[in-house]
């Protein structure tokens, strides 16, 4: 799934993921600090199926894959994904900002833009799964009035997760 045109904010724009973004994304996701709370495998557990899935992200029929880019210098600073459910009323999101750009307001601006985009696409609910220990991400979702829907434990990475929901 792809958007027809970039989503443009004050400091960032969100564009469709392309194969040229693969190395940036995998370096960020596999980084021990940056990828700590992600559900992606660590580099040593990446298999052929995962590699194929990453290769196919740019043209996935099941979800949107985005790159977050700074307007001032065109630097890639993060990734974002969004998966509509079968009713196309609920969209589940995930995001990762490169650690060099943490605590600079980019995730806030990005989430605001994605919420606005989701509203224009007629989604009624946004869900996001976040590690309970990922305080910055939990606070970001709280800032936008996401509410905890349920808590679970993800055995693979040994973190309790919260699935949060926002009705829009």
Mark where each language-model region is:
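Short, P/G- and charge-enriched loop/turn segments at secondary-structure junctions
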Residues: 1-2, 53-56
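Conserved GNAT-fold acetyl-CoA-binding loop/helix
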Residues: 33-53
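Short loop/turn motifs at secondary-structure junctions and domain boundaries
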Residues: 56-62
């Amino acid at each position: 799934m792809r958007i027809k045109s970039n989503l443009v904010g004050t400091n960032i724009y969100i564009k469709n993921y392309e194969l040229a973004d693969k190395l940036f994304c995998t370096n960020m996701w596999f980084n021990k600090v940056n990828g700590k709370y992600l559900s992606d495998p660590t580099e040593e557990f990446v298999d052929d199926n995962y590699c194929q899935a990453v290769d196919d992200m740019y043209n996935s029929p099941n979800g949107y894959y985005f790159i977050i880019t700074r307007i001032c210098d065109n630097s890639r600073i993060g990734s974002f994904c969004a998966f509509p459910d079968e009713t196309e009323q609920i969209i589940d999101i995930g995001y990762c900002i490169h650690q060099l750009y943490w605590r600079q307001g980019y995730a806030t601006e990005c989430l605001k833009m994605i919420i606005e985009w989701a509203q224009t696409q007629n989604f009624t609910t946004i869900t996001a799964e976040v590690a309970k220990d990922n305080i910055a991400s939990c606070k970001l979702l709280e800032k936008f009035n996401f509410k905890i829907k349920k808590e679970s434990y993800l055995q693979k990475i040994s973190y309790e997760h919260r699935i949060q929901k926002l009705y829009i």
